[in-house]
């Protein structure tokens, strides 16, 4: 699980999607929708309705004179069944 699903994303859009019971994660670029759905359902004990994936374009990175690119990643938006939820942040 840790190798495929790296971490949850908490951006403005991701927090807005939480109201629609949609959660955003960064995952391994080689992972497909079927394995992501199975991992999320098993690990968090929820029912996944849909999995939407996209691979944002790589950004250029410059360190001194050398120029390269940031690492590739895949972002996933997972829609859960109504009533199910994932606890991302600890309650204070």
From Swiss-Prot:
Instruction: Kindly give the InterPro entries that the UniProt entry links to this protein.
Output: Nucleotide-bd_a/b_plait_sf, Ribosomal_uL23-like, Ribosomal_uL23/eL15/eS24_sf
One BP term from GO: translation
UniProt keyword terms in alphabetical order: Chloroplast, Plastid, Ribonucleoprotein, Ribosomal protein, RNA-binding, rRNA-binding
Q: Which residues form a coiled coil?
A: none
Q: Which GO terms describe its cellular component?
A: chloroplast; ribonucleoprotein complex; ribosome
Gene Ontology terms, MF aspect = rRNA binding; structural constituent of ribosome
- The source's domain of life comes to Eukaryota
> Which one Pfam family would you cite for this protein?
Ribosomal_L23
Report the subcellular localization: Plastid, Chloroplast
- Summary of the function given for this chain in its UniProt record: Binds to 23S rRNA.
Tell me the subunit arrangement. Part of the 50S ribosomal subunit.
**What's the family?**
Belongs to the universal ribosomal protein uL23 family.
What is the official name of this protein in its record? Large ribosomal subunit protein uL23c
* Organism expressing this protein natively: Mesostigma viride
């Amino acid at each position: 699980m840790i190798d495929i699903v790296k971490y949850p994303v908490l951006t403005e859009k991701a927090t807005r999607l939480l109201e629609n019971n949609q959660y955003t994660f960064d995952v391994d670029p080689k992972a497909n929708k079927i394995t992501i759905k199975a991992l999320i359902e098993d690990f968090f004990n929820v029912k996944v309705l849909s999995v939407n994936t996209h691979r944002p374009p790589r950004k250029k990175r410059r360190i001194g004179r050398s120029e390269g690119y940031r690492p590739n990643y895949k972002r996933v938006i997972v829609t859960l069944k109504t009533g199910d939820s994932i606890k991302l942040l600890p309650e204070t």
